[in-house]
């Protein structure tokens, strides 16, 4: 029996309309009744996630900003890592050949230079909102991450530019087909989960994890049992072909698996 369960949010626990379904909530609460520790491992900001776990009365550790922050059940910061200031400076002040919008995150929130109301749909359930400002005027110190949102092919070309400029000063990954993230070196959900597991006295082999995107790769590949969503990015399935693929987030597939696992732990699982 696993001791720690880690869940990505968008495309995994959340349905396509970015809501947490009732079946999913029931399954999570059943895990807690079995004394299984929960952690939500997400690219979302900790300010938003505190609202989410408060609204649904969920006791969970938080890995936020794609591994840049870890918070305890009580909201205490257990770990933090920011982009190297020179890397943040380079991203903020370079001229990029892209149509993608730039978004900057720090402990104060989410900042962008142009209104993108379509991006707020993913945050409607929490009310989390960007703040408009000129990114070039933002201090390069204490930047958690920077992300670019736009067309996938455009972002692939941008990734080449960013790699050429940043080299090994940052870690780049796609958290969705339309979102490219610039993160601190060595920062990912898997590394953060290793820190949290050690803090709790667990091994990664005693963890299970669920995800759908390339920012879940390290986490899914490092735990005792990793599960890929049926709606996952093709690149993730190709990178981790040995992991079991479950159903689609639109059908609350995580809850379907967990219910089976809790009721029939010794029987093989099929998403059908």
From Swiss-Prot:
Gene3D superfamilies: 3.30.1240.10, HAD superfamily/HAD-like (3.40.50.1000)
Alphabetical list of InterPro entries matching this protein: Cof, HAD-like_sf, HAD-SF_hydro_IIB, HAD_sf, HMP-PP_phosphatase
Residue numbers annotated as active site: 8
Top EC class of this enzyme: hydrolase
Annotated residues for binding of Mg(2+): 8, 10, 212
UniProt entry keywords in alphabetical sequence: Hydrolase, Magnesium, Metal-binding
Cofactor (UniProt): Mg(2+)
Domain of life: Bacteria
EC number annotated for this UniProt entry: 3.6.1.-
GO molecular function: 4-amino-5-hydroxymethyl-2-methylpyrimidine diphosphatase activity; magnesium ion binding; phosphatase activity
Keyword Ligase: no
Enzymatic reactions: 4-amino-2-methyl-5-(diphosphooxymethyl)pyrimidine + H2O = 4-amino-2-methyl-5-(phosphooxymethyl)pyrimidine + phosphate + H(+)
Function: Catalyzes the hydrolysis of 4-amino-2-methyl-5-hydroxymethylpyrimidine pyrophosphate (HMP-PP) to 4-amino-2-methyl-5-hydroxymethylpyrimidine phosphate (HMP-P).
HAMAP family hit by this protein: HMP_PP_phosphat (MF_01847)
Family, similarity comment: Belongs to the HAD-like hydrolase superfamily. Cof family.
Protein name, as recorded: HMP-PP phosphatase
């Amino acid at each position: 029996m696993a001791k720690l369960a880690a869940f990505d949010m968008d495309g995994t626990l959340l349905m396509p309309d970015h809501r947490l379904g009732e079946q999913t909530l029931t399954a999570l609460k059943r895990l807690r009744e079995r004394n299984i520790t929960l952690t939500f491992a997400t690219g979302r900001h900790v300010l938003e996630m505190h609202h989410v776990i408060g609204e649904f009365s969920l006791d969970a550790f938080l890995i936020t900003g794609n591994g840049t922050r870890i918070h305890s059940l009580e909201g205490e910061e257990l770990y933090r890592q920011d982009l190297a200031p020179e890397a943040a400076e380079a991203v903020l002040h370079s001229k990029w050949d892209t149509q993608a919008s730039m978004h900057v995150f720090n402990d104060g929130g989410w900042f962008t230079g142009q209104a993108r109301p379509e991006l707020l749909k993913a945050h409607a359930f929490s009310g989390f909102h960007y703040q408009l400002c000129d990114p070039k005027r933002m201090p390069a110190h204490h930047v958690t991450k920077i992300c670019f949102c736009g067309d996938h092919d455009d972002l692939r070309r941008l990734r080449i530019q960013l790699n050429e400029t940043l080299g090994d000063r940052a870690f780049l990954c796609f958290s969705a087909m339309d979102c490219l993230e610039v993160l601190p070196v060595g920062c990912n959900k898997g590394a953060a989960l290793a820190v949290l597991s050690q803090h709790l006295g667990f091994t990664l082999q005693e963890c299970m994890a669920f995800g759908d995107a390339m920012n879940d790769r390290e986490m899914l590949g490092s735990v005792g049992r990793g599960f890929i969503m049926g709606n996952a990015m093709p690149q993730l399935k190709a990178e981790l072909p040995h992991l079991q693929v479950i159903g689609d987030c639109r059908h609350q597939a995580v809850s379907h698996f967990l219910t089976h696992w809790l009721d029939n732990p010794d029987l093989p699982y099929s998403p059908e």
